[in-house]
């Protein structure tokens, strides 16, 4: 199949500046990532008080009820009427006036016209020439919508300008943001159904294989790769091959293992595990194009269908293995759990548990969010839900997800944070996308090109700076009969330093029998 598809060679990166502390903190200069020139922190949860918010929610209806001389039912009535306006007002005020978490990073304080070009007189007057000609910061949600509609442009490279967004954008909550959250996201969270999953996944992944070849490259893997060397710029293919190798090692993959790959995408891991390790892999995806691509790829690698296959089905309808027990030795779920919806997350993990042999292992790669949030984190998450991954509302802080894992009977063996690895992967996707601009625009239009340019560029920043991150979990059933000692050799994070040598103390000889 790859012989019939042309991929761009990832365009060369521009030369990056050396590390310095000109902005107030020391920046990095690794060729593996796009290094942050302005890693500023904005306002966030440290100045947000739930106590004050809940007090206002209770006291405002209470005060009105008291003045009217009425009772509890009246309080409930006014609470229901006023709750949403109070919430909107409080979040708007706090996101507008809260102080930054810290001010170690100093803003350049350049005029907004240094970064952006507005294309209508009204927008120029509002943002570019106001405030004595210096302009005013634009709410990031407002900017997104204007940019997608072609009413404002970056002066320079999208990613380079987004690196300085704290200097030209605010993270104030807007009416449009509230509208989407209340009328778009909340109903999806509540009603997250199987038919909804099918509609959203197929709309996203069956858009056209060419759409994804234009940024994913030959491996066609839509998940984070892994950096192995921070002193050089590894190719996108190297990052993904690193990840595949890490996955196989972490689950101690062996010939003949029966593996279920939930959300298998275009079948690259399925093909890798089948061809290199001789595993029997069943990959499942809702994408029809992905199913066709994956099965063709397996055939090209000489994998018979009675060994491995890609099945187009919902995870709730995953087929049983060919083992007498019908269960799997290993299960892999790579950035799939986020899409099941927070309401069904526990049920999804229970299904993984029930499909796994008692001595099996679960590899789960999961995109998460930081608990100590900043307003830019919340706005980025809402953008992602609106434009990129509708229904993917189960990205959560680590503590919540780990609690769900443990509550269904899994024991977490290890967890690795690979957020900066994701940033490296996204940086290469971004450059591929920019390099294929003409192809994208000719087929899908300027708006789709801009949406995904912004998505990829902002995600490079978000996953490097901590707005979003990614975790690799290895889990096993938390039962007494599990032979835990067998997995010790695979715990490379523990074994590596030990094998390098541990001798340090003076020899002790004063023993007694």
Swiss-Prot record:
GO terms for molecular function: methyltransferase activity. Its main location: membrane. InterPro entries: SAM-dependent_MTases_sf (IPR029063), Sphingo_C9-MT (IPR052290). The chain crosses the membrane at residues 52-72, 74-94. The keyword Flavoprotein does not apply. It is an enzyme of class 2 (transferase). It is found in: Membrane. Disulfide bonds: none annotated. Its EC number is 2.1.1.317. Pfam families: CMAS (PF02353). Disruption phenotype: Produces only non-methylated glucosylceramides. Has a decreased hyphal growth rate. Catalyzes methylation of the sphingoid base component of glucosylceramides (GluCers) at the C9-position. Sphingolipid C9-methylation requires 4,8-desaturated ceramides as substrates. Glucosylceramides play important roles in growth, differentiation and pathogenicity. The methyl group at the C9-position distinguishes fungal glucosylceramides from those of plants and animals, and may thus play a role in host-pathogen interactions enabling the host to recognize the fungal attack and initiate specific defense responses. Belongs to the CFA/CMAS family. This is Sphingolipid C9-methyltransferase. It comes from Candida albicans (strain SC5314 / ATCC MYA-2876) (Yeast). The lineage of its organism: Eukaryota, Fungi, Dikarya, Ascomycota, Saccharomycotina. The gene is MTS1.
